[in-house]
Amino acid sequence: MMNNGTETLKEFLNYIQFERGYSAHTVTAYQHDLEKFLNFIYKYDSILLKDFGKIDRQAIRHFLGKEYEEGNSAKTVARRLASIKSLFNYLVQAEVICDNPAIHIKTPKVEKKIPTFVQENKIEELMKMPDAVTLIGKRDRAILELFYATGIRLNELAGLNIGSVNPQEKLLRVLGKGNKERIVPFGKPAKHALESYLKKRGKSWASPQETPLFTSRGDKRIAVRTIQQRVNIYLKAVLGGRTGASPHTLRHTFGTHLLENDADIRSIQELLGHSSISSTQIYTKVNPKKMIEIYRDKHPHGS
């Protein structure tokens, strides 16, 4: 990749990480997509990397076509295109170029798979799977309960601190995508699991706002990968070895069970921390107090 392309990509990645608050995982995905694109452009016509304004729609389409030829799925190609559009939007905003050449390229249609979720009658079986005596077992039980009770994302759970939890009010302060903070309620089962885990951990914390809620050996913050591995073991056992099970399965389960119990779709959207599904969604935001009341009433573990 030519130096100008490398520097431009570095500036863009710094922008989305430090100014937009994107997670390290998301930044890495953007980097992978865009390095592939810029390496293609260098081979396609290296002169273009000296002036991004000369990269046109045809060059981008040529790259996307090459991606299909290499056997990539529509989902992967759609993600590559989204990364390219974001890069050029940044360059337009920075007044490096005048127009985004990717703006009118249609995103490939991606088949939406019905997400895997745990049936309500299997939840208790899932929660009883971790060893109820050991520290790791109590930690895993608390993780499962919190995933199901709140629907938070994997990275959000891994980033929780002791100070993120208000056990008296049964509320969780979550830092989501784009560093957006939201308050999420949880119920008694999650509260009891958390209290049992923290009691077993048996330490006092001088700075709860900076002390990890979930830890592994050496009292270090639990790794995302460790959470995935532990949760996947329990889910696969309950789901009969079905593929595709992951911590995100419990997020889908959270939303599905609320919907099945007649919760309002917009309330679910708020609880999950989703972005607006349309430009009009901002006008239909529910009252936070009402949202908590709906959660307490509708979620099986919300009381």
Where in this protein do the model-derived segments appear?
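Conserved catalytic core of the tyrosine transesterase superfamily
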Residues: 1-303
